[in-house]
């Protein structure tokens, strides 16, 4: 604001890997505040850029929605729920206040030859109609799996949306799992936990090889994906800041009973 420049604010809702959702009303209030330049003139409004890959079913920017009154653009990774993992093309939309940017984005895609291919359009057109139902079914499976883990391993810390947030439409099918550890020093505890993480994932991918995969993606059509560190973006994160917890992505089609059995066997082995 002081420089009379445009502030581009980028946020991921829910966050990855800890599946956090901010107070949207508070966010709206901050984004809507009137600010002044160094000369006392009214500053340019900020632009809010939302990554809603983990909840592509939510209408954050529709008329009357919380963020409809601020300049906003939302995007989702097409490689996740929109295509069920069948293509990599994503998409973005803007609300009425942010629509001025749509033509600029389209021009950028054209100049960079970065538009989706005909095949990608075809895949998205085929998969998008079933997306909301797939999200609903996957969330149901995830909630059941999370409840089971909380029951058989209450010492574990699970990052997942609350029932209250779920009732508001935040129904992701991914959670992060911080396994209990032991040791006399922080280093011993971290080493033990990392070994335990790999023991769990090895059990899952070897005992359920047709469904459990060591993969960082999300929104897949079937099976269960496990990964450590909990997000692919941590490949560029310095080692000391990496989050060595397991991220688990559950699908609408999964043998949940078998996954529960393998997890229970794992718990009993530690």
Regions found by a protein language model. Give the residues of each.
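Generic structural signal for residues positioned in beta-strands
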Residues: 74, 174-176, 247
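Conserved PLP-enzyme active-site core in the AAT-like
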Residues: 1-150
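Conserved beta-strand positions
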Residues: 11, 50, 177, 248-250
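PLP-dependent enzyme catalytic core of the Aspartate aminotransferase-like
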Residues: 1-7, 21-42, 222-270
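Conserved small-domain helix->loop->beta segment predominantly found in fold-type I
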Residues: 123-135, 143-243
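Short, acidic Gly/Pro/Ser/Thr-rich loop/turn segments
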Residues: 100, 182-185, 255
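Structural alpha-beta junctions
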Residues: 32-44, 68-71, 150-157, 202-216, ...
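Short beta-strand-to-loop capping motifs
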Residues: 94, 177-181, 250-252
């Amino acid at each position: 604001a002081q420089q009379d420049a445009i502030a581009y604010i980028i946020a991921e809702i829910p966050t990855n890997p800890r599946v956090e959702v901010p107070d949207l009303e508070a966010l709206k209030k901050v984004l809507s505040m009137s600010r002044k330049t160094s000369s006392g003139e009214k500053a340019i409004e900020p632009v809010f850029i939302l990554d809603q890959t983990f909840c592509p079913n939510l209408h954050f920017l529709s008329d009357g929605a919380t963020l409809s009154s601020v300049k906003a653009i939302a995007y989702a990774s097409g490689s996740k729920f929109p295509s069920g993992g069948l293509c990599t093309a994503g998409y973005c939309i803007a609300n009425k206040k942010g629509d001025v940017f749509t033509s600029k984005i389209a021009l950028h895609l054209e100049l960079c030859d970065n538009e989706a291919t005909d095949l990608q359009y075809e895949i998205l057109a085929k998969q998008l109609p079933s997306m909301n139902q797939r999200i609903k079914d996957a969330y149901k499976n995830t909630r059941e799996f999370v409840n089971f883990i909380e029951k058989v391993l209450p010492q574990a810390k699970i990052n997942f949306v609350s029932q209250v947030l779920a009732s508001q439409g935040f129904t992701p099918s991914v959670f992060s799992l911080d396994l209990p550890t032991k040791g006399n020093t922080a280093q011993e505890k971290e080493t033990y936990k990392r070994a335990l993480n790999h023991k769990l994932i090895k059990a899952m991918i070897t005992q359920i090889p047709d469904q459990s995969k060591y993969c960082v993606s999300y929104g897949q059509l079937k099976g269960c994906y496990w990964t450590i560190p909990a997000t692919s973006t941590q490949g560029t994160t310095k080692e000391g800041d990496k989050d060595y917890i397991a991220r688990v992505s559950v699908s609408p089609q999964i043998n949940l009973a078998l996954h529960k059995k393998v997890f229970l066997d794992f718990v009993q082995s530690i």
